[in-house]
Amino acid sequence: QFTPTESQKFVFEYGKNNQVHTLTPGESLDAWTMRGNLKQPNSKRETHNSRSHWVAAWNAQGEILHPEIAVYQEKVIREVKSGKKDKYNHWDLNYESRKPEITNTIIDAKVTAFLPENVLTIGGQFQHAELRDDSATGKKTTETQSVSVKQKAVFIENEYAATDSLALTGGLRLDNHEIYGSYWNPRLYAVYNLTDNLTLKGGIAKAFRAPSIREVSPGFGTLTQGGASIMYGNRDLKPETSVTEEIGIIYNNDRGFSASATLFNTDFKNKLTSYDIGTKDPVTGLNTFIYDNVGEANIRGVELATQIPVNDKWRVSANYTFTDSRRESDDESLNGKSLKGEPLERTPRHAANAKLEWDYTQDITFYSSLNYTGKQIWAAQRNGAKVPRVRNGFTSMDIGLNYQILPDMLINFAVLNVTDRKSEDIDTIDGNWQVDEGRRYWANVRVSF
């Protein structure tokens, strides 16, 4: 950080992260996978993820105006090594040919004006995303290609203090996508302090999500289904649009106790999917898959959360979410049957977690957490079965510690899924589709300067 004057600040940041995720048969994943009646040994897989980023930002604080501008860029590269044991019982791993590389650049600018009974914000954003990856050009050959897309937005938002207890916020955002054109997205929110400890808040917002670069590039073919098929992007895709309403109530006191309940409802359309169009690709001779928009859907539910200070050193936090999701149109089918009324894929009806924290000293905190994910149903067109597949719920436990070893250095260590709990074996007939991660160890060092 650089502060040339009391009212101005320049911020510069650079970071680089490298992560290796290893899945070993018989340890962090099942040794075998059942595909129908066929038992197949799993391969060992190492995923190397490299992420670098930089930030340059400036802000100023005047008596009325607070301007800000920031430029962000991140580059993510993924490399995968996989293989099976050789005749000497040693793992023979080789890098796969694909090496996806994504570069995201974002420029944000806004100015906030603190006016009598109003806080007005006006701003804009520019995004540029570029993807370099393999694209199939022949049955056994690939070629590295590069595609990019730009997106711009301007927005205005105003928070109005209607009374000492009521604040109203209204906003309007105009998104302009290089492919999809312009979309208006309004937002309205209200916060009402019923008492000093009890707050009621709620609102409604419209949003849209554009498909990824790969999904909208018709000349970009990616092998799928183990190389048996090829999937092309679709320039005619529409972005997913949604309208969300929520209302919640929050209680907190000066002793650190808090509790909240929130009801939410989201309706969206143009859900993104992919499927086999039933023809052979003229270039590769493989089965052809395509991305498309289908159907309307609804997600609604309730979220409950609380934080309880037991004493000065112990505290408990917990939350629970009930989610009811369903498809509301009959333009999706599985094995000739409409999926209308089926839940959205991989969306658990029940999810909960609880965490216990203990401040052993001022600098060391131990914690333990329980995490529950309920039963999930995968009823999509490409679920690998002829009927909706069911994945049973399961509970896992994590333990860890945070250690402020120096004023500017924080160490985090955790054992995830400490009991090595797993849901169930893969069953492509009508059951589980996901291999669970076993016990993992995680460590992080954060240095501030």
Annotated model-derived regions:
Residues 5-7, 13, 117, 145-269, ...:
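Structural signature of Gram-negative outer-membrane beta-barrels, strongest in the C-terminal barrel
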Residues 269, 372-381, 402-449:
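C-terminal beta-signal and adjacent terminal beta-strands/loops
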Residues 161-165, 260, 264-267, 286-381, ...:
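Gram-negative outer-membrane beta-barrel transporters
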Residues 49, 73, 88-168:
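Outer-membrane beta-barrel transmembrane domain signature of Gram-negative proteins
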Residues 104-110, 145-147, 151-155, 234, ...:
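Outer membrane beta-barrel strand-and-loop segments of large Gram-negative receptors
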Residues 5-67, 73-102:
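Flexible loop and strand-edge segments within Gram-negative outer membrane beta-barrel domains
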Residues 16-20, 62-64, 73-77, 115-117, ...:
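Transmembrane beta-strands of outer-membrane beta-barrel pores
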Residues 1-2, 56-60, 107-113, 154-160, ...:
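Residues on the lipid-exposed face of transmembrane beta-strands in outer-membrane beta-barrel proteins
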